[in-house]
């Protein structure tokens, strides 16, 4: 939201360049992006960790950062979603009439009051649509949780479906995989129902 606001509602220098640079990560496949983060933040031989251990004289063979955690997966997935979020929110800012914010300012409202009383209510449908999109993308995403989560045996919904159909011992459990897939469908339907109620 902040990046979209800066590019669409302020006169910062090179804002067109900033808007284009935000979209560059969309050109990189998510699996390749996850591999790049592994090269940087692998706890044993990631470039950032090796440099930090040598700079600060840390005696540990691992860390200080570990990409193979749930927070690491959230970090990488979150960065992957920034360009999409920017596109959705920036389009909403672009379509909104700036004179509404100007009238609020002329009525004596400060920036925070204008944001809470004018900007956010107008942008609520776009913000909710973006939120629903991101929740569904995160739930169904497999490549980043697969690469980062398999190593640490962290299972999320998408990887749990994979493990149910690729059992290490015995036959695949297609019933469990179907039930887990139905959870994604139920979540998507509930989000759409909530969107209809709130907009």
For the regions a language model picked out, list residue spans one by one.
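Membrane-water interface segments at the C-terminal ends of transmembrane alpha-helices
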Residues: 1-94, 122-143, 147, 177-196
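Glycine-rich helix-loop "coupling/hinge" segments at transmembrane-helix boundaries
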Residues: 143-170
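Membrane-interface segments at the starts/ends of alpha-helical transmembrane spans
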Residues: 61-66, 163-175
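Short helix-to-coil transition segments within interhelical loops
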Residues: 10, 96-123
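Amphipathic alpha-helical segments in well-structured domains
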Residues: 21, 48-49, 112, 154, ...
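Short amphipathic alpha-helical coupling elements at transmembrane boundaries
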Residues: 19-22, 50-57, 98-106, 117, ...
């Amino acid at each position: 939201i902040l990046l979209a606001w800066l590019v669409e509602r302020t006169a910062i220098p090179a804002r067109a360049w900033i808007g284009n640079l935000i979209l560059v990560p969309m050109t990189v496949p998510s699996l390749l992006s996850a591999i790049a983060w592994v090269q940087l933040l692998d706890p044993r031989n990631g470039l950032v960790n090796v440099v930090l251990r040598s700079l600060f004289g840390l005696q540990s063979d691992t860390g200080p950062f570990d990409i193979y955690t749930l927070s690491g997966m959230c970090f990488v997935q979150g960065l992957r979603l920034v360009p999409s979020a920017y596109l959705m929110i920036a389009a909403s800012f672009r379509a909104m009439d700036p004179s509404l914010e100007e009238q609020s300012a002329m009525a004596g409202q400060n920036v925070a009051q204008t944001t809470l009383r004018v900007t956010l209510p107008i942008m609520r449908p776009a913000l909710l649509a973006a939120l629903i999109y991101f929740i569904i993308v995160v739930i169904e995403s497999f490549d980043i949780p697969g690469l980062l989560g398999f190593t640490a045996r962290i299972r999320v919904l998408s990887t749990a479906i994979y493990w149910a159909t690729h059992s290490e011992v015995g036959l695949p459990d297609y019933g469990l995989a179907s039930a887990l897939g139905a959870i994604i469908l139920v979540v998507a339907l509930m989000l759409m129902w909530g969107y209809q109620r709130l907009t």
